């Protein structure tokens, strides 16, 4: 998968022959069950070598920029999202720095200047509730109208449901905040994970025969599940071990910071 860190950096690796793209766009936080339906459609449509698949996503999350008081937490770090998209088979990933200037693009400016002129769009595959353009005023019907105007196809994907409940990043965040890992993992389609660096603690566990490791999560926007005790599978280098994880403040040993 080729990774570009802005729209202006993007170019098709096609030996000088500009291929058209079949693309989708969004924040794709979690790359969950619903997202995968769209992403897999994109890859299926590019089995014909005339086209290349492309995902446009953004960092930081638009809500972090447009709602400065938002305390939204992310399901994925950038590295996690890249790995998940790569597993699906996406050929081109554009991670564009979202800022206020970008947010002021009108719907038509976005379509004409970016989708058509930069990405050479052949087809866009998008969720039914997608909104875009300044103040998110344009919807799927507007996108279809632009498709007719600029000669590209639009495929609309309906909401994906599990047990008659539509899957969304918001519902997964809620499940994690409630400590409902089973539901969160079902909606994600994989086990939620935390990645960090082991930091030295007070080493009290080893004195009673239960050595522990304190995990420092470096990305402060990563969602930490509800305080509690969880069964975990840990990957340390090439070694995988099972264990217990406590998220909380360790009041029995006067712990003052969350670990």
Give the role of each language-model region.
Residues 12-77:
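N-terminal catalytic cores of NTP/NDP-binding nucleotidyl/phosphoryl-transfer enzymes
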Residues 104-211:
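Classical nucleotidyltransferase
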Residues 2-12, 94:
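Short acidic-hydrophobic, aromatic-tinged amphipathic segments that line or gate anion-handling sites
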Residues 73-81, 105-111:
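Glycine-rich, highly charged phosphate/nucleotide-binding loops
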Residues 80-94:
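A glycine-rich helix N-cap at a beta->alpha junction
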Residues 32, 85, 124, 184, ...:
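Residue-level signal for inorganic ion chemistry
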Residues 201-259:
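Phosphate/ribose-recognition catalytic cores of enzymes acting on nucleotide-derived substrates
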């Amino acid at each position: 998968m080729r990774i570009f860190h802005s729209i202006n950096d993007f170019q098709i690796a096609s030996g000088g022959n500009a291929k058209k793209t079949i693309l989708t766009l969004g924040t794709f936080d979690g790359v969950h069950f619903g997202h995968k339906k769209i992403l897999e459609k994109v890859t299926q449509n590019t089995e014909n070598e005339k086209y290349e698949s492309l995902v446009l996503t953004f960092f930081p999350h638009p809500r972090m920029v447009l709602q400065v008081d938002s305390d939204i937490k992310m399901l994925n770090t950038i590295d996690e999202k890249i790995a998940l998209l790569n597993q699906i088979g996406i050929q081109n990933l554009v991670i564009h720095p979202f800022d206020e200037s970008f947010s002021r693009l009108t719907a038509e400016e976005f379509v004409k200047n970016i989708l058509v002129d930069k990405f050479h769009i052949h087809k866009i595959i998008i969720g039914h509730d997608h909104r875009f353009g300044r103040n998110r005023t344009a919807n799927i019907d507007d996108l279809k109208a632009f498709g007719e105007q600029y000669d590209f196809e639009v495929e609309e994907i309906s909401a994906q449901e599990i047990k008659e409940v539509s899957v969304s990043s918001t519902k997964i965040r809620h499940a994690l905040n409630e400590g409902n890992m089973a539901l969160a993992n079902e909606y994600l389609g994989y086990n939620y994970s935390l990645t960090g660096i082991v930091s030295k603690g007070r080493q009290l566990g080893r004195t009673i025969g239960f050595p522990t490791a304190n995990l420092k999560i470096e990305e402060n926007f990563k969602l930490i599940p509800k305080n509690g005790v969880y069964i975990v599978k840990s990957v340390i280098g090439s070694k995988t071990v099972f264990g217990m994880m406590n998220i909380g403040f360790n009041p029995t040993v006067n712990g003052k910071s969350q670990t």
